Amino acid sequence: MLCAARKCLNKTFISVRLNAFSCLAELNFRHTWYCSKKETPYQLERLQEEDIEETFICGKGPGGQKINKTSIVAQVKHIPTGIIVRSQDTRSREQNRCIARKRLTEKVDEFKHGNDSLLARKVQRIVKKKKQREKKSKRKYGNKIDDQDSSLNNNEAKQDVI
């Protein structure tokens, strides 16, 4: 028998698990507790339909006559902030509409939260991983990489002199 309980306290999930073997017999009762802290995943806020204005306009660019005469470009405007997003990624009007709405929610999130937005967090995570890779390579290879770079720069300097 396995009993599990989850509680949400201040954006932190605490998981508790209780293993019970042969609950009827008091002597053979065994239980294990563990707690783990996990942050809740970042959720983009849903935009209100009243705040969004959608229009479909004719496409521009390569694609010939078909793209120039059909209205497949989705243009979505967030009225309170004035942010406008266009999408012409696919040939389908509905897919372009979905893509434009997704981009608009990301832009509004970035506008409202700044460095705390989803895109900023992704960039911070990428920068952090890049620094970790560089640190690991320096630990592994030492100054060999720096020596190679300096020798290349010295060779270029010698060629400039000649």
UniProtKB/Swiss-Prot annotation:
Asked if the record carries the keyword Nucleotide-binding, the reply is no
Show the Pfam families listed in the entry: RF-1
**Taxonomy, superkingdom:** Eukaryota
Q: Where is the composition biased (Basic residues)?
A: 128-142
Q: Where in the cell is it found?
A: Mitochondrion
Gene3D superfamilies the record matches: 3.30.160.20
Task: Please give the residue ranges the record annotates as the region Disordered.
Answer: 128-162
**Single annotated GO MF:** translation release factor activity
Show the transit peptide stretch. 1-18
User: What's any GO biological process attached to this entry?
Assistant: mitochondrial translational termination
Q: Which UniProt keywords apply?
A: Mitochondrion, Transit peptide
**Which InterPro entries does the protein's record reference?**
Mito_Transl_Release_Factor, Pep_chain_release_fac_I, Pep_chain_release_fac_I_sf
> Where is it chiefly localized?
mitochondrion
GO annotations of cellular component type: mitochondrial inner membrane; mitochondrion
Q: Which residues cross the membrane?
A: none
Q: Which family does it belong to?
A: Belongs to the prokaryotic/mitochondrial release factor family.
Tell me what this protein is called: Uncharacterized peptide chain release factor-like protein C1105.18c, mitochondrial
Q: Native species of this protein?
A: Schizosaccharomyces pombe (strain 972 / ATCC 24843)
